Swiss-Prot record:
Coiled-coil regions listed in the entry: none
Species classification: Bacteria, Pseudomonadati, Campylobacterota, Epsilonproteobacteria, Campylobacterales
GO molecular function, one term: large ribosomal subunit rRNA binding
One Pfam family recorded for the sequence: Ribosomal_L10
Protein name in UniProt: Large ribosomal subunit protein uL10
Gene: rplJ
Function description: Forms part of the ribosomal stalk, playing a central role in the interaction of the ribosome with GTP-bound translation factors.
Leader sequence residues: none
CDD domains given in the database record: Ribosomal_L10
GO CC, any one term: cytosolic large ribosomal subunit
Length: 164
């Protein structure tokens, strides 16, 4: 009876993972050997604030969920923590920032963007891109620059006329 209950639990877990992986734009797999529970919980809290999921999943269950969701095939070995979400840049930044703080205990092993395998170097390059909010700020600055220069020019013209 207990084996049947365990099997049912695994089937439900795989179904839940499939639905979450299907919506994810990015999925990163990291080695977390030697990382304390407290530090892993800190990562989860940072991720939760950004809408990113963090979960330690058995490789066989993750493999089944990924395969049934259409992700490219990965050879999963050893202990892994899976991170996924809808924003590739935010997820990449989170992983590489956390990796810098915990070099010996947290390493990116594999990445999948839009269900296709990408190299660790690719994920690192994406982590260096500006976030959506930063890009919007840059764009807004570019759009307002002509008006700002026009107003500054008018103000300088007014000051020049007042001096004469």
């Amino acid at each position: 009876m207990q084996k049947q209950h365990q099997r049912q639990h695994k089937v439900e877990l795989v179904a839940n993972l499939k639905s979450q992986f299907a919506d994810a734009k990015a999925l990163l797999i990291c080695d977390y050997k030697g990382l304390s529970v407290r530090k892993l919980e800190a990562l989860r809290n940072k991720a939760r604030n950004q809408g990113i999921k963090v979960q330690v999943i058995k490789n066989t269950l993750a493999h089944i969920a990924m395969k049934e969701t259409g992700y490219s095939d990965l050879d999963l070995k050893e202990t892994n923590v899976f991170l996924w979400g809808g924003d590739q840049i935010a997820l990449s930044k989170l992983v590489f920032d956390f990796q810098k703080e915990h070099k010996d205990h947290f390493v990116l092993k594999a990445g999948l963007f839009d269900k296709e395998s990408v190299s660790v170097a690719h994920v690192e390059a994406v982590s260096k891109l500006p976030s959506k909010e930063e890009l919007m700020g840059m764009l807004l600055s570019v759009w307002t620059a002509p008006a700002r220069y026009f107003v500054t020019g008018l103000d300088n013209l007014r000051k020049a006329k007042e001096e004469n």
